[in-house]
Amino acid sequence: MSRDYSYEIYSLRQQISTMSSERADILNKISILKQNKSKIQSKKSAISEQLSQYDLIKAKATSNFAGNRRDDFNNKVETLKGSISQWLKNTQNNIDLIDQKISTYTAEASNLAIGMNYASQSLNTYIYLQSQNED
């Protein structure tokens, strides 16, 4: 009496299809994260460049202000520099979190690929066994 492997074949095909869909979703998320990370890094670099120019602005404005007005201007520039420096640090932390998420998703995609490979090998075995039963 021969065994019917139809259920195993069907089940493995469903599992492979599900894993393939999940992997495609994850790869899409990785792509989006990488694109957005690039945009964030570009903006961060531009703002960092602008921050380096603030001391030049202060130096150029020396003749326009004197006394308390000068001190107020310098304080405002320093406060702005501090706020921007904090923003740059926070942005770098966010970039690091994006990198961690990309690594996590990459590992998940790799695990799904391994699972799909194993399921495909099992599927091929069951298809072979089923074909032997039909002979």
Predicted regions located by residue number:
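Preference for long, well-ordered alpha-helical segments
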Residues: 108-135
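Short, charge-rich amphipathic alpha-helices with coiled-coil/heptad character
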Residues: 1-33, 92, 126
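Long amphipathic alpha-helical coiled-coil segments
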Residues: 29-41, 89-116
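Alpha-helical segments in soluble extracytoplasmic regions
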Residues: 29-60
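Secondary-structure edge/capping motif, primarily at the C-terminal ends of alpha-helices
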Residues: 26, 30, 58-61, 65, ...
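Short coil/loop "hinge" linkers that interrupt or connect long alpha-helical coiled-coils or helical hairpins
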Residues: 49-80
